[in-house]
Each structure stands twice: as structure tokens, then as C-alpha cells.
């Protein structure tokens, strides 16, 4: 039983107008020509102005305006590029067409998701792990589920995140009111425990040095580092959570890329059902980034400090804030989990894995220190002594390639770039050639290039 406590008192989501910076009010009045008497949510005031991916998009557009005739290649945001297998889309198409008939029309479904799909998810991904279909909550994607889980957690909990980490964990925590203000000097939010995960600790936090928090956000395979936690490490994490009465929010969105037998689910670890919620997605697994389909697992054994089942509260939140995933998307999800669908999906994922290998071989040959990339689509490339946004700009300006600055994932990401294996093969090959030409002709200018590479 976890010792997480929730309070019924309302969180301070608003304050007097005098606490709103004058510059912010001036901005609103200038943009709108006036204002209401509604006071802005003070938690939104805490957010940094530039969320990572919109800022990358802004710089990308500026670059296109500056260089309108060049081919820009993205090795950046983790969007899939290959077509969804026809076997899956035809099933979705047939279902959609059926909506135009009396026999095939379907309206609202269960907020928790189609029963057949929930059963298929439990049997496909959690066979022999004791996950039941009633514990599966089908959604419109993992990122949406993270926000709904924040509604469950509330503003009075303490949180820990890997550093570097996927930005949505922290930003959603800021919005719900779990954090203090952002410190420019440390690049950290108050009231958040940042767990360093880098080469010095095999990208797994030193739990002996980690203070207790109510909630631990943990992603494996990790975005952005590309590392997957070993079975031994996840045993340590579960034991740590049980000792402290904490809940783990385990993000397994990239589990399909694991190749070495490492755990694909936190529930492979004994005792995890008592302390962990798992969030996952069809986005990277099946190329559903635009279709939008995911799921969360809330075990029956997961309880509040007073013994009340957490699954009951999450069900209430889902039925209040969500009318269920698209029935067309859910039809596609069922097709994905058929034997033929799984075979086609594996073929597409192998394509991305080959892309990743091409990029890995290229970067290693250049003497760069490359981490990750074995059980995930992402490479985590170290540029020692350099600011990640500076390296991002330098590569963009000279090669017309988009990457992702590591500092956007937290202070532990400074000096790194995330490079993605998602992309068309011809773009991956062309990008590799450009990177080779760029670094080979400029080696003497870069202190972060070494004669030996360091890969995992």
C-alpha cells in the first residue's frame, strides 16, 4: 500500500490581479485591445516561454525562409514517417464506411475503451503478467494520459523525474501546480527532484542519493537518451518505490524497439502492481502518431494510503474528462494486434532500426561519443564543452539538418543532441553523407570530437 496522501482543499490556481506581472497584462491588452476580469492561472505563468518542439519548429521555419531552395532533413522530432500497413488501414476504412450504414453505425463507446481491444492489449503486451482487461484504459495517446494522470495526482504531491527527461512530465506538473518557479541559473523547477541519468551512472539514477517523493516518472526505453533499464535496475526501482510508499508512472512507449530481452513492462518485476502505473502508445509501435491511440494500466492492487483503489478514481476522471478514443482508431488498434498486423508492424519497426544503425555507424566513424540507439530509435550524441543549442544551430546552418538540443530535456541534457532514426531511408542516407562531409572538413575546430568513440 502506498502512503501517497491526497487533500481535498482546493489548490491555489488563481491569485489577486496584483500578482500578475504588469508586462503580462500589457501584452494581453496590446494583443486583444482590452481584458476581462479573469485572472490568469498562476501555474501557466511559471512555464518557460519556449516549449522545446515548438521552438525547434520556429527555428526550422526561419531556416526555410533563409534557405528556400535547400532540402531540409529532419532527424529531430520523434514522428514516424512510413505508411501504416494496408492491412490495418483497410480495416479502419471498412469500419469507417460501416458508420454510414444502419448496421455498422456506432456512437459513443465505453470511456475506458472497447472491451475487445482492452482484452487484446492485455493478452498481447502483458501475457503472463496478470494484467486484466478491466485494468486497461484505452486513450487518445500516452501524452494525453499523462495529463489525465496529473488530474488524478493533484497539486499536493511531490515528483521525481529522470534528468534528462521528456518535457511533458515536468510541464504537466507545472500546469497542475506541483512545482515552484523555474530557476534560470539551475535550469530546474523548484519542488522537483531531478535524478541525474548519464554515462557516469549507466543512465540510471543513484537511488541511494534520491530523496523520497510521492511520484516517480520513469521512461524506458528512455526518451531522449535511448537507454533501456535492465531487469536488475527495475527491481531496484520497484523496491525503492515500495520502501518509500511512492507511485511509479512508467512510460513504455518505445518498448517495441527493445531487442536484448530487457523488460518491456514494469509489471515484469515482482511487486510492481502494488506501486506502478504504466502508460503506453500505438504511436511509435504502429505509426499511429496522427491516428492517436494509447493506453494506461491501473492495477487493482494499487491503493491510496487509506486503502481506497486508485483505479476507481482514474475511472471517474476518464468518464468525466474523456468520451473515449475514436472508434475508428480503436478498430485500427485491433487490426494492429492481429497476427498479420503484428507481422507488418515488426517489418516497419525493423526499417527504423536499420535507419538507426546507419546513423550510429556514421556518427561513431566520426569519432563522436554516441549513447543509446540499441533498444530505442534515438541516439544521444555528446558534444563535450559545447552548448546543445549552439551545436543544433551549427549543424542546421551548415548541413540543413534538424536535430533536437539535449538541454530541452533538462539540465542533464546540456552538451547533447538527440538524433532520431525515424525518417525515410533516402533522407537518412543523405543526412549521413552531409554529417560526414561537415565534420570531416571541420574536425580541428571541434573540441568535442575524439579519436575514439564511446557507445553503449
From Swiss-Prot:
GO cellular component assignments: chloroplast; plastid
Up-regulation conditions: By ozone, benzothiadiazole (BTH) and infection with the bacterial pathogen P.syringae pv. maculicola. Down-regulated by nitric oxide.
Phenotype upon loss of function: No visible phenotype under normal growth conditions, but during infection with virulent strain of P.syringae, mutant plants have reduced levels of SA and camalexin, and show increased susceptibility to pathogen. Leaves show decreased ethylene-induced senescence.
Main localization category: plastid
Places the protein is found: Plastid, Chloroplast
Role description: Aminotransferase involved in local and systemic acquired resistance (SAR) to the bacterial pathogen P.syringae. Required for salicylic acid (SA) and camalexin accumulation upon pathogen infection. Possesses aminotransferase activity in vitro and may generate amino-acid-derived defense signals in vivo. May be involved in ethylene-induced senescence signaling. Involved in the biosynthesis of pipecolate (Pip), a metabolite that orchestrates defense amplification, positive regulation of SA biosynthesis, and priming to guarantee effective local resistance induction and the establishment of SAR.
Organism: Arabidopsis thaliana (Mouse-ear cress)
Protein's name in the database: Aminotransferase ALD1, chloroplastic
A Pfam match: Aminotran_1_2
Superkingdom of the source species: Eukaryota
UniProt binding sites for pyridoxal 5'-phosphate: 108, 142-143, 223, 251, 254, 281, 283, 292, 323
GO molecular function, one term: L-lysine alpha-aminotransferase
Amino acid at each position: 500500500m502506498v502512503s501517497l496522501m491526497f487533500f481535498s482543499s482546493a489548490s491555489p490556481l488563481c491569485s489577486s490581479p496584483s500578482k500578475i506581472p504588469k508586462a503580462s497584462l500589457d501584452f494581453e491588452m496590446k494583443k486583444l485591445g482590452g481584458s476581462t476580469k479573469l485572472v490568469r492561472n498562476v501555474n501557466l505563468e511559471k512555464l518557460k516561454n519556449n516549449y522545446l518542439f515548438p521552438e525547434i519548429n520556429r527555428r526550422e521555419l526561419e531556416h526555410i525562409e533563409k534557405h528556400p531552395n535547400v532540402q531540409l532533413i529532419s532527424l529531430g522530432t520523434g514522428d514516424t514517417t512510413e505508411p501504416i500497413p494496408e492491412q490495418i488501414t483497410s480495416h479502419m476504412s471498412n469500419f469507417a464506411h460501416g458508420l454510414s450504414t444502419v448496421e455498422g453505425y456506432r456512437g459513443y463507446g465505453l470511456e475506458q475503451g472497447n472491451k475487445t481491444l482492452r482484452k487484446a492489449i492485455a493478452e498481447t503486451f502483458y501475457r503472463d503478467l496478470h494484467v486484466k482487461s478491466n485494468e486497461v484504459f484505452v486513450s487518445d495517446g500516452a501524452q494525453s494520459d499523462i495529463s489525465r494522470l496529473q488530474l488524478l495526482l493533484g497539486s499536493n504531491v511531490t515528483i521525481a523525474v529522470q534528468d534528462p527527461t521528456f518535457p511533458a512530465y515536468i510541464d504537466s506538473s507545472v500546469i497542475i501546480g506541483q512545482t515552484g518557479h523555474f530557476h534560470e541559473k539551475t535550469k530546474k523547477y523548484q519542488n522537483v527532484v531531478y535524478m541525474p541519468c548519464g554515462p557516469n551512472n549507466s543512465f540510471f539514477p543513484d537511488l541511494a542519493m534520491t530523496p523520497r517523493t510521492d511520484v516517480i516518472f520513469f521512461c524506458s526505453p528512455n526518451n531522449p537518451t535511448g537507454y533501456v533499464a535492465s531487469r536488475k535496475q527495475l527491481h531496484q526501482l520497484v523496491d525503492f518505490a515500495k520502501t518509500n510508499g511512492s507511485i511509479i508512472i512508467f512510460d513504455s512507449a518505445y518498448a517495441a524497439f527493445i531487442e536484448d530481452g530487457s523488460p518491456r513492462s514494469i509489471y515484469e518485476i515482482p511487486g510492481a502492481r502494488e506501486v506502478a502505473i504504466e502508460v503506453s502508445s500505438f504511436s511509435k509501435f504502429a505509426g499511429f502518431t496522427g491516428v492517436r491511440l494509447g493506453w494506461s494500466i491501473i492495477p487493482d492492487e494499487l491503493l491510496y494510503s487509506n486503502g481506497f483503489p486508485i483505479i476507481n478514481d482514474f475511472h471517474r476522471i476518464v468518464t468525466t474528462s474523456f468520451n473515449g478514443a475514436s472508434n475508428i482508431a480503436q478498430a485500427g488498434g485491433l487490426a494492429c494486434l492481429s497476427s498479420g498486423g503484428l507481422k507488418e508492424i515488426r517489418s516497419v519497426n525493423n526499417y527504423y532500426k536499420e535507419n538507426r544503425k546507419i546513423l550510429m555507424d556514421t556518427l561513431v566513424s566520426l569519432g563522436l561519443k554516441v549513447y543509446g540507439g540499441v533498444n530505442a530509435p534515438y541516439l544521444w550524441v555528446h558534444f563535450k564543452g559545447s552548448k546543445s543549442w549552439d551545436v543544433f544551430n551549427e549543424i542546421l546552418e551548415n548541413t540543413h539538418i534538424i536535430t533536437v538540443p539535449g538541454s530541452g530535456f533538462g539540465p542533464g541534457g546540456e552538451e547533447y543532441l538527440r538524433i532520431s532514426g525515424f525518417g525515410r531511408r533516402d533522407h537518412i542516407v543523405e543526412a549521413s553523407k552531409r554529417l560526414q562531409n561537415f565534420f570531416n572538413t571541420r574536425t580541428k575546430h571541434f573540441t568535442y570530437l575524439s579519436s575514439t568513440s564511446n557507445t553503449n
